[in-house]
């Protein structure tokens, strides 16, 4: 999988740029604040439909401009695709091969990317919502070729049913049939979501083991789903109908208390991913260095699972990895990426710390949003 060409117009501080990328390492250098991360953000937007900085479309426009436009030409499984993303205040539009797409997440079907930024550490240190988002994205991208209903569709329908039940909880009177209808739908979708998450984590674990070893960690990191159904037995993970029945019963039993609190407390929207290093909670007992390598290993395991699913490696997009890893960590990371043979994008103002031996990088230098190919790394980026 490869991004061959990218055109940007009025994106962040970039007025206009057209870039052709190499099949291996593409190294983006330049002073801080001049557009290195903006370029990676554009690539991530074309691959995932969302900003890795969690910015709305209005914030991505160049100052004073009404809209921005990204266009990427990709090769995936020997097929070419043309991806476009238009954004303006309160509105965005996506086209794939000239046809409008109903959801930005559809971009991932033509361009898969694994993105590593300093914020990746949030997988370990932040609350359950960040980890749920991670496993849901992996379940969507790694399950989309199996013919089953997309995890993204299931998750979207679940959120609609959840909002509907939460509205019922605030009403003074509700007919029994209405409770039954929404709770049955919520339980069925919730069981499907929980099972999808459980299955993708089962597939992710062996890849995580290998990536940790490649990154030089002797400890074992386990990632498990903490689900409310666990206390009622583990059989739910293998039996979707049993999980749905359990959810229906729990929703009915907790209806009175949830009416008092005003929100649904039962369901996969309350799940978490438990990360343990040699049996100990990583967030509480892991060192900063261990947490950083563990978070990186999770993203690399995601990439390997994608490769297993798609038959080719996704793009690797790394924003200033040298700021998060020591010399040994960088050497191991770049060696691992070189062995993968996929297309890599690295932005760094510490170019001298990137061990690119064997990767033959294509180098870009950016100055105030203007990009140029360069044979040498300018001294101010060293």
UniProtKB/Swiss-Prot annotation:
Q: Does the keyword Cytoplasm apply?
A: yes
Q: Which SUPFAM superfamilies match?
A: P-loop containing nucleoside triphosphate hydrolases
The GO terms describing molecular function are: ATP binding; single-stranded DNA binding
Q: State the GO CC annotations.
A: cytoplasm
Q: Which positions bind ATP? A: 30-37
Gene3D superfamilies xref list: P-loop containing nucleotide triphosphate hydrolases, RecF/RecN/SMC, N-terminal domain
Task: Write out the GO biological process terms.
Answer: DNA replication; DNA synthesis involved in DNA repair; double-strand break repair; SOS response
Family classification: Belongs to the RecF family.
This chain belongs to the protein called DNA replication and repair protein RecF
User: Which gene holds the coding sequence for this protein?
Assistant: recF
